[in-house]
Amino acid sequence: LGVTQVEVGDDLKAMGTADDYLIQADKNPNSRGAVDLGLAPRAGVLGGQAVIEAAKAGKLAVLLLVGHDLGADAVAVAAKATVIGIHSHAHVGALASTLLLPKAVHAEQDGSFTNVKGRVQRVRKALEPLAESLPGYTLAFHLAESLGHKAPASSPTEIFSLLAAKVPAYEGLSLDGLGN
């Protein structure tokens, strides 16, 4: 797709309080999965706020936001960059997007997540998506195809198979073989 930077944002660094038994300091679901995929904040990649500042300065032509609310920066960013927003909820950042793609919430799509201990668990769709909302993976496929690229997979099972083939932490796993 010609993407030069992928950033999951500074939220991955946001930590809360923890105990020695059950409560983890990391309050982000699936941050371990992001780390396994190499998407954790790292040297040479703009952090969340730095990406926003670069967009406000006109240094980014396109900004793809998945679920991130730009808040007070939304209008300034939208004035300088094409903002493609993939969001499940209405907020200032979503409404300021040049192109807004309605994303289903987690309960409206199949998939998996990796907990802080590395256990990969399956998530099953519990509800049908509202209105024209689509699962995030479907929106990503449509976006890739609209840019002239063939989507590498068409279902959560196929996506997970690709993940298992390319990421050592998921080798030998299959979506159907995961526990809930």
Located regions from the model:
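Non-catalytic alpha/beta scaffold blocks inside enzyme catalytic domains
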Residues: 1-176
